[in-house]
Amino acid sequence: SGRCYASICCVYESVNDKEKSFSGNDNQAIGLDFSPSKAYIDSYNQSALNYAPFKQEAKKHLAHLQRNLSRTKKGSKNREKARLRLAKFEEHIANKRRDWMEKETLRLVRSYEVIGVETLNLKGMMRFSHNAKNYNDVSWSKFVSLLEWKSAFHNCSVVKSDKWFASSQLCSHCGFKNKAVKNLSVRK
């Protein structure tokens, strides 16, 4: 997109080398369930704060820029200008998503000692779904990797559940497995 970046590498010693311990309070643990429209739903049935489907919000302007690019003649200066405008706008969308992820993951690791997340087969989910664009827009794997990275610097642990664990069918209080619940909008 026509921008230059500088990278600086530093080596530092961690001051916080104490052993991670769990206090045992129920309000210090949270589970996150993936949601294509709201990023996640936590174990208290709350959706992510300030989440907006970034690419879906900007799809009209994105389509306009893509049309402008496709209408220009290949090899022309106007095509290069249109390509740069499109690249800058896509970078803007990515920066908004990254900024939201950084702020939300930091809020979560500062607020909770244990964060449970589900491991998903996103490639398989995107292959057979009409929600593939939403799955891609949420960028769940990047969100989880940021959680893991930030939890190393705070007194927090990230626990991943198995890919095939029926977390949506289990009661969070008593552990009863309701096999009749296949509708993912029912989260009780």
Give the positions of each predicted feature.
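Positively charged, helix-rich recognition surfaces that bind polyanionic ligands
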Residues: 2-188
